[in-house]
């Protein structure tokens, strides 16, 4: 039986859906920290999230009839909720508001993995040559070079910089291999942000 999340984790904001993919008046279901949730958008377009009882994926529902709701935020194109009492605001992604930036959801894929393990794998460049062969890495270029890590109490995040890796096809437009530099931000135990130069 899964262990219940600690109160600190329950009080964090967690992503539950790409807001643009959440239909109006149709139930979507998900699990958050082993807690069954249901969600939809009301006629006003605002997301509504609640503890799932007998609702099924695809059921029609009037969001106005949902009285016991979980807290909801929309930010960065996603719907966020909290199972406890949210104590903090969401972490900033200042680039999201840049007027010349195109922001999009690239879809989501359900995988059977814990949130900490998903973040750990996302941060691990060592898998590039073996999992993303001939795109993000290839043998014999398997070295993960030394990089810098900063734990910032002021920003409440971990920042890894100078993360360099030789990539055969770092971008769709790439015609030759190049060394790419990554910056990883971990501003939340279950969220990571990637900046890539190519």
Describe the residue ranges of each PLM region.
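N-terminal pre-ligand scaffold of iron-sulfur
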Residues: 1-53, 61-86, 167
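C-terminal catalytic domain of Rieske-type non-heme iron oxygenases
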Residues: 43, 87-198
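Detector for the c-type heme attachment site
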Residues: 56
């Amino acid at each position: 039986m899964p262990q219940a999340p600690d109160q600190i984790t329950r009080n964090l904001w967690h992503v539950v859906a790409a807001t643009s993919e959440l239909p109006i008046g149709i139930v979507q279901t998900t699990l958050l920290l082993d807690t069954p949730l249901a969600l939809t958008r009301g006629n006003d377009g605002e997301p509504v999230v609640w503890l799932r009882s007998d609702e099924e994926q695809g059921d029609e529902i009037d969001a106005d009839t949902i009285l016991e709701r979980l807290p909801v935020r929309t930010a960065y194109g996603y719907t966020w909720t909290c199972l406890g009492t949210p104590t903090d605001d969401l972490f900033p992604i200042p680039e999201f508001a840049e007027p010349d930036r195109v922001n999009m959801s690239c879809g989501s894929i359900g995988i059977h993995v814990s949130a900490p393990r998903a973040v750990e794998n996302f941060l691990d460049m060592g898998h590039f040559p073996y999992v993303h062969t001939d795109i993000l890495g290839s043998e014999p270029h398997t070295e993960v070079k030394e990089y810098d890590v900063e734990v910032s109490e002021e920003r409440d995040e971990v920042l890894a910089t100078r993360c360099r890796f030789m990539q055969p096809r770092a971008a769709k437009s790439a015609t030759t291999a190049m060394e790419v530099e990554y910056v990883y931000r971990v501003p939340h135990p279950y969220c990571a942000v990637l900046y890539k130069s190519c």
